[in-house]
Design a protein with these regions (language model features):
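Positively charged n-region of N-terminal signal peptides that target proteins for export
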Residues: 1-4
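N-terminal signal peptide c-region/cleavage motif recognized by signal peptidases
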Residues: 13-15
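Beta-sheet-dominated interaction scaffolds and their linkers
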Residues: 18-42, 147-159, 191
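Asparagine-centered strand-capping/turn motif at beta-strand->loop junctions
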Residues: 41-45, 164-170
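Short, hydrophobic/aromatic beta-strand segments
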Residues: 47-55, 167, 174-179
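Short, basic/aromatic beta-hairpin or loop at an interaction surface
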Residues: 57-67, 176-180
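Intrinsically disordered, low-complexity Pro/Gly/Ser/Thr-rich segments with frequent PxxP/GP/PP motifs
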Residues: 63-96, 184-211
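Terminal connector regions
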Residues: 94-145, 149, 211-233
Length: 233
């Protein structure tokens, strides 16, 4: 999940209250055989906030008015009252154009805009409105792709010095969070996510040899870290 701070108004006095809306997940899967999925928002703050939600296909700089997506979010903009919640419903309008033999990755954006406090508004204070934008992985999974839990076991690794190619022959996105020898010190410094039926190269802190068996940790649908053993080719 990535967070990006957006600044509104002029920076004269600092009065920011943001990041109070909690989302019920770190990633969202849309099964192809479902009519819709829901995302739960909770506002634990003592004041209401506005929340705007939209999907993008990987361009973090794209604005909602420039994005074409087959998904419909209801409501796209909502007021989330203090100590209350809001349900977002995401429905697929048409699956035309979406791959039927592998997953498609989108990103769910949530922009939280805190309100201006009443006395600040009345006194005409200049206020810094700090809006927090969060992005979550949103994956469309067509029906009939098989068992996602076993996908990481099908990864293959190809070494070239201190570089390692992670080959993903499955129809699923697989997030690799950690690569190590027997669960020891991590060899990778960043998380990678090889797309379905493709490969991605990651730099390692030390070279690995053909025939070695590495521990590969991947993130499952529920955000849990799962380790599998994979031999280097």
């Amino acid at each position: 999940m990535k967070r990006i701070a957006l600044f509104f108004c002029f920076i004269f006095s600092f009065a920011a209250h943001a990041n109070n809306i909690i989302v019920n997940g770190t990633r969202f899967i849309y099964p192809g055989n479902e009519k819709e999925i829901t995302v739960q928002l909770s506002n634990n703050a003592d004041r209401p906030a506005l929340a705007q939600a939209w999907l993008d296909n990987g361009d973090a700089d794209a604005t909602p008015d420039t994005i074409t997506t087959p998904f419909i979010i209801t409501p796209p903009i909502s007021r989330v009252d203090a100590k209350s919640g809001q349900t977002l419903r995401i429905k697929l309008g048409s699956s035309a154009g979406l791959a039927k033999d592998k997953e498609t990755l989108w990103w769910l954006n949530l922009l939280e805009i805190p309100p201006v406090v009443a006395n600040q508004k009345n006194e005409g204070q200049n206020v810094l409105q700090l809006a927090i934008r969060s992005r979550f992985k949103f994956i469309y999974r067509p029906a009939g792709l098989g068992n996602r839990d076993a996908a990481a076991e099908k990864l293959t690794l190809t070494a070239s010095g201190s570089s390692l190619a992670i080959n993903n022959p499955t129809p699923f996105y697989i997030t690799v969070s950690r690569i190590s020898r027997d669960g020891g010190k991590a060899l990778n410094s960043k998380t990678v996510m090889p797309a379905p039926q493709s490969s991605q190269t990651v730099a390692l802190s030390s070279a690995v040899n053909r025939g070695e068996t590495l521990t590969v940790n991947n993130i499952n649908d529920y955000g849990a870290d799962v380790a599998v053993k994979v031999a280097v080719k």
